[in-house]
Amino acid sequence: MSNATQSVAAARIDSLLDANSFVEIGQAVTARATDFNMTEKKAPSDGVITGYGVIDGSLVYVYSQDASVLNGTVGEMHAKKIAKIYDLALKVGAPVIGLVDCAGLRLQEATDALEAFGEIYLKQTLASGVIPQITAVFGTCGGGMAVVPALTDFTFVEEKKGRLFVNTPNALEGNRVEKCDSASAQFQSEETGLVDGIGTEEEILGQIRTLVSMLPENNEDNDSFKECTDDLNRVCDDIAGCTGDTAIALSKIADNGEFFETKAAYGQDVITGFLRLNGATVGAVANRSESYDADGNKTEISDGTLSARGARKAADFVKFCDAFEIPVLTLTNVTGFKATLCNEKMMAKSVGEMVHAFASATVPKVNVVVGKAYGTAYVAMNSKSVGADMVYAWDTAEIGMMDASLAAKIMYEGADASTLNEKAAEYKELQNGIASAAARGYVDTVIKAEDTRKYVIGAFEMLFTKREDRPSKKHGTV
């Protein structure tokens, strides 16, 4: 039974957790008096409610900032309470969820607040890759507090009241909030790669519950399986038409059609998210060139090329999956790298990070080539050569250096249209045909699109006990 006093902060916790499961820790803690503290003001719980509870029966630790107490500012004891929650979570191996609504550091406590706040950074860093960390921003999250969600694994921002920034929009050189509201949920979700989802408070709390139910409790949790009520050999009807919007393809492959997408508004040419296959959580990375809304209206996202943002998004996601022993499934449909000045600034670095993430990951990795797979963009997308354990390809897929018509124009420059068409057809059959890739061992099995679910489930079942030795080192440097 919760002992938390009724407030917005407490109500958020009650909405997040299973009914009557929250137990508050440190309710009596209050601000320490310093030279500039307004000691006559009451500060219940020092502006943050901390404790533990369960989501679908799984233990989680929670802290929720109370903006009605000293504006939710972070003081020394406020920060120490959060750090204490991290200590407990690390001891027992359970996720930490932060519900943020904060006006920043408490000015009156000066360096006491700063030093205690640094403890939060340290605890988050120690917890990274050990327990899942999730942040939801319901009010202001500015200045140094903005680093907190950056150190967590998943971040959600309330679409109207949520404000996430290091420097306010008006403090940015040459900018005003009316020109570009860089602290808004929309900007942060589309431009920074930090935010996984936006919505109302109710929607965000529901998304967190769904996410927690799909994640392991810690990096050594081998029991995060759910009973599968779906047919393991189910035929995926109409999946062959989903090469453009692979979010739909992933839903068709998943148990009961359930796919949880992360960072949907950022780097939209790449999809990342979680699904279950035979009850086990799998992380998915897929190329996307188009999307469909609820009414079936199509939106073009890219020309089939990989962007720098998409590569960075994939890299971060694969690193998370590898840290928590979550197998990785990729759906490949990519024709090259996006050729714009903006992308070129970060393309090599971002693709390098993605390749490093795929190649370094020791979890089971399965790749399905669902469309065109050309050039080094194909190689970077979890190909056999960078470490995929199993590679499948639809019988309609293509794998090669480049599009056949472009190759013909390069090799037979100056030839007439008839000759170019003939040579392009010849090149497509000999070099881009999926049979050629299979003959060289780059593809393990050519499959029909509708059989994708049973093949990937079989592959992950076979790879369940995978062990892989790597050269001894402290960590990579990419």
PLM regions: where:
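Ligand-binding clefts of soluble mixed alpha/beta catalytic domains
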Residues: 1-478
